[in-house]
Amino acid sequence: MADTVEFAKMNGLANKILVVDMRGRKDMVTPAAAIALNSNPATQFDQIMAIHDPRVGGTDAFIDILNCDGTKAQACGNGTRCVVQALSSETGKTSFTFQTVAGILNAVEHEDGMISVDMGLPRFRWSDIPLSEEFHDTSRIELQIGPIDAPILHSPAVMSMGNPHAIFWVDRDPMTFDLERFGPLLENHPMFPEKANITLAQVISDSALRTRTWERGAGLTLACGSAACASAVSAARTGRTGRKVTIDVASSPVRVPLTIDWREDNHVVMTGPAEWEWSGSVDPVTGVWARDAVERGAV
């Protein structure tokens, strides 16, 4: 294959990730390549994490993030953990600083293999999320699905974790709701001019939540790290839990919870696993790919 780059199929809590090594190149992974890769069951993904050479001093790489529909994403916590594991395997380093379009992310791999990512600061101002209407209190806005007198979902908390999130609090298992039906309607609601990630969240205890997410640009996903962060922040902000919680991602077959710590300095730190599956080469323009005959174990 001519003009190819190395990539790895990985996952973070079953959130399907392609880590593509674009270092040493000036071009980007194209939307056409993303759509082509997602059309093949072997390379189907939620996000592409494209690793580029650093653009600013003090960082290890610039990360360009694409959704499976070819659109750009501002943040992907599960994908960031995958990048950390891939680069740690390659370099032996355990601490990294990345630049994304949403800002700077710091991450560290621990001795037990778990990876912590500082996802930055949550933003609550309506214009920062953004919303199409002004709300002074974004911990509960006027928005619902279903009949006016008996809504199925209503009054979400909204915020930005580098990307827009709406958290609907529910009193039963999030898996019992038809999110595949409601997700697209809410993602594309006029309230969200840049669309939004839609999460159903249930309080299990004062230190545990259960969530399920319809991801902007990706659809019904097995896991979404930034949505877990938004859920944890919303829970603490509204007095449902403390500032450090575990998140049981209801749709993920990986039964390892995420730990989210909304620290006193306002930074949100997510800790969880990442898993390497296999490696290959791909044309970043067309999406034509081939699997390696011998696994590399690093990008």
UniProtKB/Swiss-Prot annotation:
Write out the catalysed reaction. (2S,6S)-2,6-diaminopimelate = meso-2,6-diaminopimelate
Q: Which domain of life is it from?
A: Bacteria
Gene Ontology terms for molecular function? diaminopimelate epimerase activity
Broad enzyme group: isomerase
**Biological processes, Gene Ontology terms:** lysine biosynthetic process via diaminopimelate
Where does the record say this protein resides? Answer: Cytoplasm
Task: Give, as in the UniProt entry, the pathway in which the protein acts.
Answer: Amino-acid biosynthesis; L-lysine biosynthesis via DAP pathway; DL-2,6-diaminopimelate from LL-2,6-diaminopimelate: step 1/1
Q: Has keyword Cytoplasm?
A: yes
Signal peptide, first to last residue? none
| E.C. number | 5.1.1.7
Q: What is a single cellular component term in the Gene Ontology annotation?
A: cytosol
Q: Where is this site: Could be important to modulate the pK values of the two catalytic cysteine residues?
A: H165, E215
Q: Which residues form the active site?
A: C76 (proton donor), C224 (proton acceptor)
Q: Could you say which residues bind substrate here?
A: N15, Q47, N67, G77, N78, N163, N197, E215, R216, G225, S226
Q: Which UniProt keywords apply?
A: Amino-acid biosynthesis, Cytoplasm, Isomerase, Lysine biosynthesis
- Protein family according to the UniProt entry: Belongs to the diaminopimelate epimerase family.
| Quaternary data | Homodimer.
Read off the PANTHER family from this record.
Answer: DIAMINOPIMELATE EPIMERASE, DIAMINOPIMELATE EPIMERASE, CHLOROPLASTIC
Role noted for this protein: Catalyzes the stereoinversion of LL-2,6-diaminopimelate (L,L-DAP) to meso-diaminopimelate (meso-DAP), a precursor of L-lysine and an essential component of the bacterial peptidoglycan.
- Name under which the protein is recorded: Diaminopimelate epimerase
Species of the source? Agrobacterium fabrum (strain C58 / ATCC 33970) (Agrobacterium tumefaciens (strain C58))
